Amino acid sequence: YGSFGVFGNHDVTERLLGGFSVASQAKEMRDPRFDEFAKKAKIRILDDEVMLIDDAFYLVGRKDAQKPGDGTKNRIEPEVILSGLDKAKPIIVLEHQPKQLKELETSGADMQLCGHTHDGQMFPGNLTVKLMWENACGYLKKGNLHSIVTSGVGVWGPAMRVGTDCEICPITIHFQG
């Protein structure tokens, strides 16, 4: 089927100071090097797109909530992007930030796969991140939605982690019924 992905909030051209992004622009554009990398790596980016895979399940990729990277602040809402899908088939949502869990669940999504939080990256962020996100890292079941958030391998700001681990999270999915 291939490799699929979504862009995140730091995949735009932005000014950095000490590794931290500063002076956020209203209409940030995706850095073209990310598109080139994805193409060379044969990663299909789903940018507010839905794919039906092997007539068996849906893969939905959402634009980043904070910085879509296309010069807008818009992305398609869960109830719109999931409308018209056959809800008898599993619906897996790829999204950089673990947002809108309730909306995804009520719109029929079965699973949401995310990153973004770095699990706080360093102390005390590894403690406070849990106040900001319903699922800051790990697994959470909300109604019929399974939310999985990985701490990832990247960093934001200083190139270090304290109190969190880098991870690539293999997931095995078994469809029933």
Where are the language model's segments positioned?
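Soluble catalytic domains of enzymes that build or remodel membrane lipids, polysaccharides, and related
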Residues: Y1-G177
